[in-house]
């Protein structure tokens, strides 16, 4: 049973997250895995809690 964990910045709409979940599930279906066996977990992280090159992402991408 594949489990895909996505870490991304907070702020996407419910529709956008649903699109990501459907797309990942479809990719697994294309290689023969039933959709009911695919789990997708989205962790939303505030930009202030995400570091890039020693800086907070909220400062790099305001």
Locations of regions flagged by a protein language model:
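A domain-level signal for the structural core that forms small-molecule/cofactor-binding pockets
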Residues: 1-62
